[in-house]
């Protein structure tokens, strides 16, 4: 399973100060996430409360916290997919299945991705 890491955050407030300076701390957190150094990545990404923060929490099996963060995010295919994974791990199979099917409805490519993910495959066995 491949996760896409975003170095920007969707839905940022319009009064954000624009700068050409890269957020090196955030970039370092994403780099650590890509290197699978999840605890170190979470230490950096924790204040951002974005999708990459959710991925770090899921990678450390902090599934309830991941669900809390996902509840604050706009619904899209990726957030629904991540909700499905968290639900699967929390034993909430039917809820996870609904989230996965919604992810597929929002983006048909998620169906292919789900077929490669054993946690999603487990949801679909029902």
Where do the PLM segments sit?
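Long, contiguous interaction/recruitment modules in multidomain scaffold/adaptor proteins
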Residues: 1-30, 35-40
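Helix-start (N-cap) detector for alpha-helical repeat units in TPR-like alpha-solenoids
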Residues: 22, 77-81, 111-112
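Alpha-helical adaptor scaffolds
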Residues: 27-34, 39-89
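TPR/TPR-like (Sel1-like) alpha-helical repeat modules
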Residues: 47-50, 74-75, 88-112
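TPR/TPR-like alpha-solenoid helical repeat scaffolds
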Residues: 55-61, 88-89, 109-126
């Amino acid at each position: 399973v491949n996760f896409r890491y975003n170095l920007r955050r969707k839905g940022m407030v319009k009064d954000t100060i624009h700068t050409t300076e890269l957020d090196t701390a955030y970039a370092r957190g994403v780099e650590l996430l890509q290197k699978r150094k999840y605890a170190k990545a979470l230490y950096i990404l924790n204040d951002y409360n974005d999708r990459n923060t959710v991925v770090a929490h899921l990678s450390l099996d902090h599934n309830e916290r991941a669900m809390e963060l996902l509840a604050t995010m706009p619904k899209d295919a990726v957030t629904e997919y991540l909700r499905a994974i968290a639900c699967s791990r929390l034993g909430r199979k039917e809820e996870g299945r609904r989230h996965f099917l919604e992810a597929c409805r929002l983006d048909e490519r998620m169906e292919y991705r789900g077929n490669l993910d054993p946690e999603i495959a487990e949801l679909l066995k029902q």
